[in-house]
Structure formats: C-alpha cells, structure tokens
Swiss-Prot record:
Molecular functions (GO terms): ATP binding; NEDD8 conjugating enzyme activity; NEDD8 transferase activity; ubiquitin-protein transferase activity
Upper classification of the organism: Eukaryota, Metazoa, Chordata, Craniata, Vertebrata
Subunit structure: Interacts with UBA3 and RBX1. Interacts (N-terminally acetylated form) with (via DCUN1 domain) DCUN1D1, DCUN1D2, DCUN1D3, DCUN1D4 and DCUN1D5.
Pathway: Protein modification; protein neddylation
Function (record text): Accepts the ubiquitin-like protein NEDD8 from the UBA3-NAE1 E1 complex and catalyzes its covalent attachment to other proteins. The specific interaction with the E3 ubiquitin ligase RBX1, but not RBX2, suggests that the RBX1-UBE2M complex neddylates specific target proteins, such as CUL1, CUL2, CUL3 and CUL4. Involved in cell proliferation.
Known outcome of mutating residue 41 to A: Strongly impairs thioester intermediate formation
Stated consequence of mutating residue 7 to A: Strongly impairs thioester intermediate formation
Native source species: Homo sapiens
Protein name, UniProt field: NEDD8-conjugating enzyme Ubc12
InterPro entries with a match to the protein in the record: Ub_conjugating_enzyme (IPR050113), UBQ-conjugat_E2_core (IPR000608), UBQ-conjugating_AS (IPR023313), UBQ-conjugating_enzyme/RWD (IPR016135)
Catalytic activity: [E1 NEDD8-activating enzyme]-S-[NEDD8 protein]-yl-L-cysteine + [E2 NEDD8-conjugating enzyme]-L-cysteine = [E1 NEDD8-activating enzyme]-L-cysteine + [E2 NEDD8-conjugating enzyme]-S-[NEDD8-protein]-yl-L-cysteine
Residues found modified as Omega-N-methylarginine: 169
Database matches in PANTHER family: UBIQUITIN-CONJUGATING ENZYME E2
Amino acid sequence: MIKLFSLKQQKKEEESAGGTKGSSKKASAAQLRIQKDINELNLPKTCDISFSDPDDLLNFKLVICPDEGFYKSGKFVFSFKVGQGYPHDPPKVKCETMVYHPNIDLEGNVCLNILREDWKPVLTINSIIYGLQYLFLEPNPEDPLNKEAAEVLQNNRRLFEQNVQRSMRGGYIGSTYFERCLK
C-alpha cells in the first residue's frame, strides 16, 4: 500500500515539474476511433493520405488522382478535420483544390450525403474516401453545390467535359479562374 502511495506521489511530482514519463493524457473516444479507422484503411490506388503532424490523427490531407472519367489525371487535395464528437458527428471535409464540379463549390464545400444527413457512427474514414472518389467518377447534378456546373452537366455533357479539362489545365470558366491541377 505504501509503495502505491509513493508511486502516486512520484507521478504528481513529475507532473507538477512539467515532466511526465510517457503520455499521462488519456485518448478521447474520437482519437481511439480515428486510430482504428486509420489502421484499417484500405486506400484505392488513386488515393493517398498524409499527416502534417504524425501525433495528430484528427487532422490530415487526402489526395485523389482519378484514373478515369471527366477528372482523369487531375490531382485534388482534401482536408479532414475530425472533431471530438466523432464517430457520432462526421468529420469536416473541404476540397483545397478549386475544382469545376457540381458537388463541390468554389469555396471547397463538398456535397456528399454521408457527410450530412446520411452520416452514421458505423461509417468510417474509408467510407468517406470511397464516397469522395465516387464523386469524381460519377458527378451528381441532382444534388449540386455548384448549380452552374450541374446545369451544364445535365444539358451539355460535351461542354461540361471541355469545362472540366480547361479548369484542370488552368484557365477561366466564365469569370472564375482555376489553378492548374493536373498531376
């Protein structure tokens, strides 16, 4: 009993001195779940994930380089911010690459049902990555954030394809300039 008391006392002294022998901070439910999600990732060959701080799994980047469809040969970067409410709340996902896409607006907001009303705690980071990849293979003009791009896709697929190619090469679509995003 005395040994246990002295260990507790020693730990208190170390913490008050600012030195801890290992992390005394407990991992949150969000951190534990994101660790599990990351460990179980099964990334498609068109995707890559990176962490600017390897100790911070709650903030990371995803790069998608589609190998087919309208966006073939493009390189699109997404930021993920996982809140403490995860997995009960979806992560915040933003597209950092300005893209001409019906489901991604010019500010980078993403219209993906599993990031909004269809989110369920059983969904994982892998589910979101596959959902984002699918948006590049099959843009959905029925649920748009960029209404202009959605209209063009519905009414003139050839013009939509030309606009996507022009935007990925770097150029103007109307009065909006798009940076080059070809890999």
